[in-house]
């Protein structure tokens, strides 16, 4: 049995690869959805990713996910530049936001899917610290302009829920794979 991660995310690769031997084949799909609800939207995108890769690897188990940061009802995507990153982080400063990940596993023609939601509270971020963080470039290619596992960990006052969800792949996905008979590596 082979697990294919339908993602180019190094964070998802690291989480899943910690437990299982995997192959990576990024899904080439538009990360957009006409669905309005954030939870349903992340699930819809994850499902599209999984289905697009499953046709190329019959018999393999496919894992796909889509993570979004939601603040005051708005989705914060990946910033296009430093100024967008700065605006996002200023908005999150001192506030609570949600990180939502939709995931989809395709195994033997069966679809297992779900949505994980984690609340994150940021401390107040001063201008000097914000500018230092922007200069690191860590905000690039990250929803909400931060990676909790990196330098941005100093922004976090608390989280309620699954830490790995905030990184990009809920640990529940690992549990689901073990239920399907995959054994974690040693």
Swiss-Prot record:
GO terms for cellular component: cytoplasm. InterPro entries: ITPase-like_fam, Maf-like. One of its GO terms (molecular function) is dTTP diphosphatase activity. GO terms for biological process: nucleotide metabolic process. It holds the Pfam family Maf. The keyword Transferase does not apply. Its EC number is 3.6.1.9. It is an enzyme of class 3 (hydrolase). Nucleoside triphosphate pyrophosphatase that hydrolyzes dTTP and UTP. May have a dual role in cell division arrest and in preventing the incorporation of modified nucleotides into cellular nucleic acids. This is dTTP/UTP pyrophosphatase. It comes from Pyrococcus horikoshii (strain ATCC 700860 / DSM 12428 / JCM 9974 / NBRC 100139 / OT-3). The lineage of its organism: Archaea, Methanobacteriati, Methanobacteriota, Thermococci, Thermococcales.
């Amino acid at each position: 049995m082979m697990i294919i991660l339908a993602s180019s995310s190094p964070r998802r690769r690291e989480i899943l690869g910690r437990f299982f031997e995997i192959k990576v084949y990024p899904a080439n799909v538009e990360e957009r959805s006409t669905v309005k609800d954030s939870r349903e939207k992340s699930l819809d995108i994850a499902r599209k990713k999984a289905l697009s890769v499953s046709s190329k690897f019959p018999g393999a188990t496919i894992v796909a996910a889509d993570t979004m940061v939601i603040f005051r009802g708005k989705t914060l995507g990946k910033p296009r530049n430093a100024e967008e990153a700065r605006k996002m982080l200023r908005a999150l400063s001192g506030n609570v936001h949600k990180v939502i990940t939709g995931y989809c596993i395709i195994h033997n023609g069966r679809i297992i899917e779900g949505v994980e939601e984690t609340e994150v509270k940021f401390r107040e971020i001063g201008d000097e610290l914000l500018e230092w963080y922007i200069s690191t470039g860590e905000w690039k290619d990250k929803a909400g302009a931060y990676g909790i596992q990196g330098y941005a960990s100093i922004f976090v006052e608390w989280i309620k829920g699954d830490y790995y969800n905030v990184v990009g792949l809920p640990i529940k996905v690992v549990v689901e794979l073990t239920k399907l008979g995959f054994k974690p590596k040693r």
